[in-house]
């Protein structure tokens, strides 16, 4: 029988030597649901891209031009709320359940305040953003509408991600996965009716008229927004009704504490800065790609979606690594934290190496899912095959950074990502894009990801990441 994370944490606090087999079972028990959740999230991106892609390359390009900006805004929020889940994991590892519940209450207030502020900011800049990014005039109206609608749902999108991370910190990776499955299913349904106009479809040998709003690109944004609203409300309801260490109904203060703010600053600020550095680099990269034409913009956007099939496993294992290592550090078991870190990283490298092989083989078929445009398929398949070589080291950087974050070493993650993205990827891309087009951009990306993976492995091997801690 597989140990629960709560049982494992109790044994770690007692100083027991836990066999490698049991350790591996816990890693897999947390990783598999998280990987499945990432698969569902990626599937939702595929659905949006495929449904819009069949409208035409311009519709795909309209979403692609603002996609990096959605990553930037959402990424900053993710970086900040991840700091709350790291604190909760470490408090639970130290058996300080009341403190963990206090962090949860403060996180709820944070979600309300910052989520609304981010939504207002996104809506406010949506009119001007495509122009700032160099989009063609024919793309700007749809791109602006997509970003505004997506931004409006940010408080709920943030709630869904934040509360899912907190559930994983307690060892429950299944519930967030089930919420994601529901959200993906709703996204399919909403997109089906909102993107396309009213039309006649075959059904059991006859033809039926199916209503559609015919909104196109804004319909895709509205479908995603509505499904995220439902997912966020559901995640909140589960936390409010749940018993266990994070039972919010138990007596406790809603006051924002100095200790929580200090922990948020020490861990969350570097994480948010890291996400901002990565995502803003993607914005610059989109700016570089936007000068290569509509086909390149569409191929780049769809290629990023297709590549998600590979790295979703890495991010699923990263989620598990944050929870496991956070609890090990909280229990003052650095030996177990090291074991979890290398075990998770090794699994991540192996799975993403296999995913890279699949990406190489099925690149044209993957692009064909999203669009019928032959030029976009050909260019997208070419750059995906370039990127396939980087997947193992990309996996190393993703999972190793999760291990370091779980221990509170978020500043090093920020520095390594900043140097890698801005010092290597953008420098190479700006040089090679005019000479080799989109292939030059993705070749630069491949080179940078390999170097980034090696940097994170070196940091992990040195062991200094265990000296930080996340609790004030």
Question: Where on the chain are the PLM-derived regions?
Answer:
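C-terminal structured "cap/appendage" subdomains that terminate the fold
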Residues: 400-437, 441-443
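Short alpha-helical transmembrane segments in multi-pass integral membrane proteins
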Residues: 1-34, 88-155, 186, 202-269, ...
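Alpha-helical transmembrane segments of multipass membrane proteins
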Residues: 46-50, 128, 162-166, 188-193, ...
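Small-residue-rich hydrophobic transmembrane alpha-helices
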Residues: 60-120, 157-176, 286, 299-357, ...
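Transmembrane helical elements of multi-pass membrane transporters/channels
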Residues: 29-48, 149, 160, 227-231, ...
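N-terminal transmembrane alpha-helices
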Residues: 18-50, 54-55, 68-87, 112-119, ...
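Residue-level hotspots within pore-lining transmembrane alpha-helices
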Residues: 36, 40, 44, 73-77, ...
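Helix-terminus/linker motif at the lipid-water interface of multi-pass membrane proteins
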Residues: 39-61, 130-137, 193-197, 207-215, ...
């Amino acid at each position: 029988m597989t140990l629960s994370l709560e049982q494992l944490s109790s044994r770690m606090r007692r100083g027991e030597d836990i066999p490698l087999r049991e350790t591996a079972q816990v890693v897999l028990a947390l990783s598999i649901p998280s990987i499945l959740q990432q698969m569902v999230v990626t599937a939702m991106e595929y659905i949006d891209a495929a449904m819009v892609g069949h409208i035409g390359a311009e519709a795909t390009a309209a979403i692609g031009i603002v996609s990096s900006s959605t990553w930037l805004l959402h990424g900053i929020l993710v970086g900040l709320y991840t700091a709350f889940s790291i604190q909760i994991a470490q408090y639970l590892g130290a058996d300080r359940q009341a403190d963990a519940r206090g962090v949860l209450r403060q996180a709820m207030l944070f979600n309300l305040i910052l989520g609304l502020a981010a939504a207002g900011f996104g809506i406010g800049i949506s009119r001007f953003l495509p122009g700032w990014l160099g989009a063609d005039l024919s793309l700007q109206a749809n791109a602006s509408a997509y970003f505004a609608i997506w931004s409006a749902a940010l408080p709920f999108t943030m709630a869904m991600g934040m509360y899912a991370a907190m559930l994983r910190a307690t060892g429950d990776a299944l519930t967030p996965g089930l919420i994601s499955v529901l959200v993906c299913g709703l996204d399919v349904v909403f997109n089906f009716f909102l993107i396309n106009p009213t039309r006649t479809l075959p059904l059991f040998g006859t033809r039926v008229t199916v209503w559609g709003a015919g909104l196109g690109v804004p319909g895709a944004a509205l479908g995603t927004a509505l499904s995220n609203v439902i997912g966020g409300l559901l995640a909140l309801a589960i936390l409010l009704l749940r018993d266990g260490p994070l039972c919010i109904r138990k007596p406790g203060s809603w006051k924002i504490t100095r200790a929580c703010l200090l922990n948020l600053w020490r861990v969350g600020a570097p994480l948010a800065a890291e996400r901002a550095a990565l995502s803003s680099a993607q914005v610059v990269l989109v700016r570089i790609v936007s000068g290569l034409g509509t086909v390149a913009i569409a191929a780049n956007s769809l290629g990023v979606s297709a590549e998600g099939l590979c790295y979703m496993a890495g991010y699923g294992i990263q989620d598990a690594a944050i929870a496991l290592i956070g609890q090990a550090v909280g229990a003052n078991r650095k030996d177990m934290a090291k074991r979890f870190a290398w075990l998770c990283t090794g699994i991540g490298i192996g799975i993403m190496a296999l995913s890279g092989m699949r990406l190489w083989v099925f690149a044209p078929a993957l692009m064909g899912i999203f669009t019928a445009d032959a030029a976009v398929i050909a260019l997208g398949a070419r750059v995906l095959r370039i990127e396939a070589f980087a997947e193992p080291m990309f996996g190393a950087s993703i999972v190793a950074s999760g291990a370091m974050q779980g221990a509170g070493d978020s500043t090093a993650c920020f520095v390594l990502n900043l140097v890698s993205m801005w010092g290597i990827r953008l420098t190479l891309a700006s040089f090679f894009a005019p000479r080799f087009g989109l292939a030059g951009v993705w070749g630069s990306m491949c080179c940078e990801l390999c170097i980034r993976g090696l940097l994170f492995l070196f940091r992990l091997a040195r062991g200094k990441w265990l000296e930080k801690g996340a609790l004030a």
